[in-house]
Amino acid sequence: MISVNDFKTGLTIEVDNGIWQVMEFQHVKPGKGAAFVRSKLRNLRTGAVQEKTFRAGEKVSKAHIENRRMQYLYASGDVHTFMDNETFEQLELSTAQIEHELKFLKENMEVHVISYQGETLGVEVPNTVELTVTETEPGIKGDTASGGTKPATLETGLTVQVPFFVNEGDVLVIDTRSGDYVSRA
């Protein structure tokens, strides 16, 4: 058991018969009344995000998540194959299980596969990934004065807003948490 006062971003807990990951939390001490913790939780099974309020000092069960380093091998229809780097055991996940992460996955990429009591919950990609621009409008001389952006399609099909100086074939660093352009690689 863990106290809600000890919440940290990324902590996994068991609440209401679900496995939840703490995305955000805030300790609130109103002028009148008892303190409480307002949190934003993501269900690791369904991906649903829910806001939940706990009384200060309330205890919740900590979920012991197994985190294995694996390599993304390939996709075959709606099935995506991963390989354990130590045992070379292969694992297949459906598109529905890793829908959000697919926008950032490239073949041979190292990821963390999360499981709870033998049930695979999903995939964690690195905080930033390097992806190649496959399609974007060419930058026109003089455009950069305004510091604007233009859409660019990346090798995984993800579309992001990028500065005007980015061209097709450029390798970009993308933040996987927000899906935003960070820099050129």
UniProtKB/Swiss-Prot annotation:
Domain of life, source organism: Bacteria
Main location: cytoplasm
Annotated metabolic or biological route of this protein: Protein biosynthesis; polypeptide chain elongation
Cellular compartment(s): Cytoplasm
Biological process terms in GO annotation: peptide biosynthetic process
InterPro entries: Elong-fact-P_C, NA-bd_OB-fold, Rib_uL2_dom2, Transl_elong_fac_P/YeiP, Transl_elong_KOW-like, Transl_elong_P/YeiP_cen, Transl_elong_P/YeiP_CS, Transl_elongation_fac_P
Cellular-component GO terms for this entry: cytoplasm
Functional note: Involved in peptide bond synthesis. Stimulates efficient translation and peptide-bond synthesis on native or reconstituted 70S ribosomes in vitro. Probably functions indirectly by altering the affinity of the ribosome for aminoacyl-tRNA, thus increasing their reactivity as acceptors for peptidyl transferase.
Protein's UniProt name: Elongation factor P
Protein source organism: Halalkalibacterium halodurans (strain ATCC BAA-125 / DSM 18197 / FERM 7344 / JCM 9153 / C-125)
